[in-house]
Curated annotation (Swiss-Prot):
GO cellular component, one term: lipid droplet
Lineage start: Eukaryota, Metazoa, Chordata, Craniata, Vertebrata
Topological domain ranges for the Lumenal compartment: 49-242
Principal localisation: endoplasmic reticulum
Positions with biased composition (Low complexity): 292-303
Membrane topology: Multi-pass membrane protein
InterPro entries tied to this protein: Seipin
Cytoplasmic side: 1-27, 264-394
Transmembrane annotation, as ranges: 28-48, 243-263
Coiled-coil stretches noted in the UniProt entry, renumbered to this chain: none
Function of the protein: Plays a crucial role in the formation of lipid droplets (LDs) which are storage organelles at the center of lipid and energy homeostasis. In association with LDAF1, defines the sites of LD formation in the ER. Also required for growth and maturation of small nascent LDs into larger mature LDs. Mediates the formation and/or stabilization of endoplasmic reticulum-lipid droplets (ER-LD) contacts, facilitating protein and lipid delivery from the ER into growing LDs.
Annotated spans, Disordered: 281-394
Family: Belongs to the seipin family.
Full protein name: Seipin
Amino acid sequence: MVNDPPVPALLWAQEMGHVMAGRARKLLLQFGVFFCTILLLLWVSVFLYGSFYYSYMPTVSHLSPVHFHYRTDCESSTSLLCSFPVANVTLAKGGRDRVLMYGQPYRVTLELELPESPVNQDLGMFLVTISCYTRGGRIISTSSRSVMLHYRSSLLQMLDTLVFSSLLLFGFAEQKQLLEVELYPEYRENSYVPTTGAIIEIHSKRIQMYGAYLRIHAHFTGLRYLLYNFPMTCAFVGVASNFTFLSVIVLFSYMQWVWGGIWPRQRLSLQVNIRNRKRSRKDIQRKVSAHQPGPQGQEESPQLSPVTEDGESHADPSGTEGQLSEEEKTEQQPLSGEEELEPEASDGSGSWEDAALLTEANLAASGSAPAPETVGSSEPSAGSVRQRPICSSS
């Protein structure tokens, strides 16, 4: 009973259990890789959108306090100042980062906090001037605006004091006015001449103020308007677009790695025809010797005997025409494992330069050589003039 073989059903169940466990581990691993890939793509998409938003969107609003200063070394009454109040404002964050972005229109305003004192009420209109400068203190833009306190009658001031008397007593309200002076409705930064600061001057020696602030607000249009007024919608669309684009890239990369590519590479075969220049040269020599007219075509001059077709001298009459040397026979036989060479052109176009040189040499040599009557005779015929080759010293 103990040594009985296991039931086939149990063996099948064990095998199926192992197979299912392996498949479960494989599926779990694939799910983990897929989940990590999705998280990575999502993080990269958010990072790309955040980088684009940070680099594309300028500073929406910039508020800088304005501290006026004036001269005090003159002899004047207590109600008058020695000079106009002047302030120098730096348009940079921390002295390094610029506030203004190139090509972006800005609305520049000056906020003045003035008390409703009899001096300010009797002041009337006064002038506010701003001068923007670049590196080196060179003025690049100037603007001036006139301003005055809002008029309120004595009866209205009395009623206002009675209504807000409790708040005025406990310090929750003050009798002051906040004037907003628009200096530039649309100020654009020049990329070649950047603005580094501004000088603000109030043309009044009797003015009294609590404080002043320079506000720079960006006026957005186009894509920046959408990014500023609909930030959540634009963020969702931007992250979704980046995620889709990255997912398509990863999907195509996976298909290229697994299936070998959607568009398989086509193998390009390049056939190179190798020409035997030595053989073509000998063929050209054979054709030149065959075209020589008269008895000159029966034998060649001694000067061309080393380069004739059959490779032997014509002084030996036993030489047979058409017999090739062992070297030419070896060259004519095709090499083992290589394709036969393509037949050359009948006109010897493969090496036309060599053909031209050999033709001139053969014609010159054949024209100067004597024409014997027979091939085997060594004596010249009657009436023929024997010529000797003359070597020029040149």
